[in-house]
């Protein structure tokens, strides 16, 4: 009978490895009698929650176990033989190191059914799981919810389409993570609001992970990746002295943009939507994790922690197009968009842990956290003088200032074309020679356009740049007639010196207006720069109380976890904009000069407030701060209860319940809070009186009334979440798991209140939105054996109710300006609504077999297979774009028994995205009968080979070759990030030019070296 079990398992795995219609679930490294829905921010009875000076009952492999990172539903760790838990994946730190994960995208590289949302220049923005993405997939770090995007689809389409906001979910530094837990399907027990499609929960490392058998640990790792030329350095220090222990993990990363396929073959000078080469960015990331703990006794532990993370990206959006502002869209670009984006997260926390067993708890943990997250998008638009001709700094003659004197480009005296002179050309014997000052004799003897100024304005020489003590160095011409270039050199130049605004200047004092002109380039001498800086701030203070208790009732074992949480979050937007100058040249005006005041009968110094002209260099402008959204304060209270009930060795249940109370409070103080543009709130709720549309006083009053009205609209939501999981083991090799869970997401303030008016794209507010609800049903069958491995097949279905989505509402007329002048204009309108229903269903397979049982020479080898197929529809038959195409991952791995070396070979196959499974929300607006998305991903297969070697005890070398066959492909997440309108992430929709920018890298390599002591 035993042999039959082994044969049945082996045959089942072999079938899964070859089946194209297989169904995958995710494995886990958790013991089977542990709760599957355990809140990740809660303490458990694991050794990592024990004081470092306490003995443990773990075996000799505990050190290795504690350095593992768990991702619910996965068993990438090559030595893991534990069968998977339903709908969860567990990935270890050892696995992330083995796979050389550098970012969140690498974490799920070999997972099926989980992908990362692409956000163009801003990188990644959260995850996509089971048909939903971004804010509908919860992300926590050490129990703290991470920054959410402004989830109103109208806001995203409107502003992200133009690259104005860094509206993304922040990432995490891989090197600081101890555990990553990915749950598929609705489950708000762990994360509260937002866990509709699933959750991704990170836990950071702790000194106790390294100090089990010694009092210190030192590690240094250096790595490099060719896909983006990223190099990184990580230093890890852990130590214990008496009752104190400390951990420091610091990481720095430096690289550039991800190199798309054919990166080196494309023209890097092309600007606009037809650009095929990835936009250039310099990307840096710094992270520091610091934890200091004090254990006064063996049952008490205090910890002060700081988790500091900063991601910076500087470069140019060369694919960005400004042509929407041009009359002739085919004109070449002049200005280019320079970016300086930042994501910054600071979390300071203090925790107290108690391990004294009482009637109410076995472990108790109280944590206070203060987290600040800032996502910033900074853009500067100006002409790139180093790349193209720029009118503002044009100097065609190459005039140069040398030792206070104006010369030719090589420092030699100026020479101009002579006109009808009888003397020797350029001879000094006749100072009255006539020249054409528009023609300069270049250093090679050829005539070129001088491009000198013929301005009527008085030029003030800055004496700190020009030699005001030697007027002869001021090259000045005297025209024969007014406003022409033919003339003579002006002799005996006299200068009038004046101190203007604390600096000494000089001007020509003996010239003739209209005839006398300085030899200077005619351009402004600087580049005008329009800049915008837009911040999204999320500041959270949170208090957690988490307890665990193990007990028995009769013969039934209970592993009880319960607790509560209270937090306040302030989310606000701050926009800054201005106008100034960059690349200032030596001939640029350094003063506005003077003008004669006839009332005062005297000459006065010009200022930015009094001048009639405009000078971006001397009079830069900074606009008042403004915002498109009211700041919102959110108060959240929650209590939870979770019990893992073990009835017998063959039957156990996981029961979870959570109650959430969410209160939104708009906060606005007139004159203090960044102002909302009038057009956004005018007549939003309170209409203007008839005929007052052009009355400025009435409009201002109406704006304030509408803001006050919004600020008083507090919103409250209550939610009850639950989860039920049953695990049945009828035999030693067969397991049946059933899951039913509920999750929710409360509408965000921007989804309810955001409005925007434009004839092409108008967003209407909707204050009647209901919370989104998700209910997941899942069943999993698992064949497993301690020596052979496992195969797990699951079927799932998630029903979404009141799914919030942006829909086209048709045309609507708005009164604009004076009705007698412009009348009414039709606006294309969109609005967030609660859809009646949405459903996602699918099948997953997850299997792993260890080959050592088949033959001795195959000891250490393993085969794995994962497969996910899912399909989803909204409102009956509208496809859900976040659903991934059918995906399967084959794996072959090997680990030497002594762990001296090993490798993994992965084959990933992704099917094409079918047109009937996509939906263009702008199809109606474009009067299209075909509602599918035009640009989709085709099927592809990629091969990766990664390995490690440990030549000596303290040294580990890892290397990998990715996309081994150099396959050209585009992922569905990249393809769906292409926008049909806007100026960012756009291509030529007619020809497809520019789409190569979105393709994944070709063959690339990674390598790292790590020393440990």
Curated annotation (Swiss-Prot):
Sequence repeats lie at residues 26-29, 30-33, 34-37, 38-41, 42-45, 46-49, 50-53, 54-57. Residues 26-57 are annotated as: 8 X 4 AA tandem repeats of Q-P-T-N. Residues 26-61 are annotated as: Disordered. Residues 213-1013 form the TBDR beta-barrel domain. Residues 1-24 form the signal peptide. InterPro entries: Plug_dom (IPR012910), Plug_dom_sf (IPR037066), PT (IPR006970), TonB-dep_rcpt-like (IPR039426), TonB-dep_rcpt_b-brl (IPR000531), TonB_Hb/transfer/lactofer_rcpt (IPR010949), TonB_rcpt_b-brl_sf (IPR036942), TonB_rcpt_CS (IPR010917). Residues 26-58 have a biased composition (Low complexity). It comes from the Bacteria. Residues 78-205 form the TBDR plug domain. One of its GO terms (molecular function) is siderophore uptake transmembrane transporter activity. It holds the Pfam family PT. A motif (TonB box) lies at residues 67-74. A motif (TonB C-terminal box) lies at residues 996-1013. It is found in: Cell outer membrane. Its main location: membrane. It is a multi-pass membrane protein. One of its GO terms (cellular component) is cell outer membrane. Keywords: Cell outer membrane, Membrane, Receptor, Repeat, Signal, TonB box, Transmembrane, Transmembrane beta strand, Transport. SUPFAM superfamilies: Porins. PROSITE patterns: TONB_DEPENDENT_REC_2, TONB_DEPENDENT_REC_3. Belongs to the TonB-dependent receptor family. Hemoglobin/haptoglobin binding protein subfamily. Acts as a receptor for hemoglobin of the human host and is required for heme uptake. This protein is subject to phase-variable expression associated with alteration in the length of the CCAA repeat region. This mechanism is called slipped-strand mispairing. Addition or loss of CCAA repeat units would change the reading frame and result in introduction of stop codons downstream of the repeat region. This may be a mechanism of regulation and a way to avoid the immunological response of the host. This is Hemoglobin-binding protein A.
